[in-house]
């Protein structure tokens, strides 16, 4: 799958890319014969409303029109969060699937950062009910040194078996490593084990980021173990915090029994067009470099650049090295959730607070709620002392139930909000309000501003 136009944008530009700017590159990619694209979801849903003053639904419609009716257009969803950072109730989860089907998407890749199967069950049912293909995800990574108890091949295969036992409907499965830290031997053992558990015709994919510099090695291990598909991106959004490059992977497979199904010369041409399209966009230095420290301080490529952009905005980028070094501590004590949105943000926020305010002086709201169980069950129990701190500061008890049971229906509240502001209560508008809240309302009221980072002051839009 070509991830250039979703995860590539998210990992390199913090998802802030205007649709007209990349369309020539999309045309060139279609001409190159690519038929499977990541087209939206993840941070590329909210970011279009937040920073581009565009509708993500309009972007998806345009994407489909460009690639034709037969291409597989895939988006990313976060289980019960769907494409929001906050948890969404059942009616909004259903509406997510309905709207993404309506606006031309084919497949939804769907993950839960805690690998809590409960958080995947309902969304899986609604995705398939609306005629979309469901690519269920098990999130993977390597733990920081000294952490034991989860994130082993055995743990992932136990999660996979539970998916099967609970009869979660899916069409394919992806092992998703957003921090790029799962070591290649672990990748091999996990894919090899999954092949033994799953029916022979099950399509298995792997997704990674090249932040640590191991992306190609991970893919080679997965291919050796029997994986069916990998995710690649094209320059200028390949490597570093994004996915390995088409050409790099093509080169790595020379002399093996495997090849990639694309025309080399046409991919080169598409890459040149893409580079021209994106030449004015500001590329944070950390987005295109290998950051070896991430191997022991897991931070997803898609979150690293978003966080550094935020730190640039508030003039605290000088704290980044200390925050990265603090990450192992918050992972170790927080229950070993996978470092992928939204848990990666919980980790980063807590690490930032530990650096800025003093270690564990303040439990951030989301990290606190996570260790208390409000986002689901963590892979291992969080540290008891951290749980006590969270109970005290959040003034909440430990929760063992299903997070969905805590949420009131979202459609009535969103409808009231639209009516209060004289806006039409279309299903699209309802979903925008539910998933984007105040910034979604600003967009619908015509009050949003474009905030896309480009190279020169004259081309930067604010």
Kindly give the residue locations of the regions a language model identified.
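Hydrophobic faces of well-ordered beta-strands that scaffold small-molecule active sites
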Residues: 1-7, 13, 35-39, 71-78, ...
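Conserved, mostly hydrophobic/aromatic
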Residues: 8, 110, 173, 226, ...
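Terminal or standalone catalytic/regulatory effector modules within metabolic enzymes
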Residues: 24, 28-48, 286-462
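Active-site beta->alpha loop and helix N-cap motifs at the rims of alpha/beta catalytic domains
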Residues: 41-161, 177-180
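Surface-exposed amphipathic alpha-helices with a cationic face
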Residues: 60-68, 121-131, 188-199, 250, ...
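Catalytic cores of alpha/beta
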Residues: 92, 151-158, 212-227
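Glycine-rich phosphate-binding active-site loops on the catalytic face of alpha/beta enzymes
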Residues: 110-113, 177, 225-242
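C-terminal helical cap(s) of enzyme catalytic domains, especially alpha/beta-barrels
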Residues: 238-260
């Amino acid at each position: 799958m070509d991830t250039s136009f979703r995860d590539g944008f998210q990992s390199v530009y913090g998802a802030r890319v205007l649709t007209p700017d990349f369309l020539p590159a999309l045309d060139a990619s279609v001409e190159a014969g690519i038929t499977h694209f990541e087209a939206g979801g993840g941070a590329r849903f909210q970011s279009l409303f937040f920073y581009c003053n565009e509708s993500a639904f309009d972007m998806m419609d345009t994407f489909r029109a460009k690639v034709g009716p037969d291409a597989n257009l895939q988006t990313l969803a976060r289980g019960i969060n769907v494409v929001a950072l906050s948890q969404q109730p059942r009616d909004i989860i259903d509406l997510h699937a309905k709207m993404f089907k309506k606006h031309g998407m084919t497949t939804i890749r769907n993950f839960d950062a805690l690998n809590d199967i409960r958080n995947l069950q309902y969304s899986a049912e609604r995705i398939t009910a609306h005629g979309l293909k469901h690519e269920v995800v098990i999130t993977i990574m390597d733990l920081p040194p000294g952490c034991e108890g989860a994130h082993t091949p055995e743990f992932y295969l136990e999660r996979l078996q539970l998916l099967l036992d609970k009869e979660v409907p899916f069409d394919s499965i992806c092992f998703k490593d957003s921090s790029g830290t799962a070591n290649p031997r672990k990748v091999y053992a996990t894919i090899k084990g999954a092949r033994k558990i799953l029916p022979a015709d099950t399509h298995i994919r792997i997704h990674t980021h090249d932040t640590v510099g191991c992306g190609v090695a991970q893919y080679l291990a997965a291919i050796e173990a029997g994986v069916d598909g990998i995710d690649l991106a094209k320059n200028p959004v390949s490597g570093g915090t994004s996915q390995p490059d088409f050409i790099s992977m093509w080169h790595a497979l020379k002399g093996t029994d495997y090849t990639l199904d694309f025309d080399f010369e046409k991919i080169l041409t598409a890459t040149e067009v893409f580079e021209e399209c994106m030449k004015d966009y500001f590329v944070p230095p950390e987005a295109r470099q290998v950051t070896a420290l991430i191997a022991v301080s897991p931070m997803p490529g898609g979150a690293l650049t978003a966080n550094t952009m935020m730190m640039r905005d508030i003039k605290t980028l000088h704290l980044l090295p200390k925050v990265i070094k603090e990450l192992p501590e918050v992972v170790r004590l927080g229950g070993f959730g996978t470092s992928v949105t939204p848990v990666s943000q919980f980790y980063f926020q807590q690490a930032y607070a530990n650096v800025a305010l003093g270690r564990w002086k303040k439990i951030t709201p989301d990290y606190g709620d996570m260790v208390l169980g409000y986002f689901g069950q963590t892979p291992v129990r969080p540290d008891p002392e951290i749980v006590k701190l969270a109970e005290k500061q959040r003034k909440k008890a430990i929760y063992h139930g299903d997070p969905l049971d805590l949420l009131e229906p979202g459609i009535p509240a969103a409808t009231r909000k639209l009516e209060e502001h004289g806006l039409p209560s279309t299903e699209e508008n309802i979903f925008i309000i539910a998933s984007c809240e105040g910034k979604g309302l600003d967009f619908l009221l015509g009050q949003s501003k474009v905030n896309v980072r480009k190279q020169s002051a004259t081309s930067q839009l604010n």
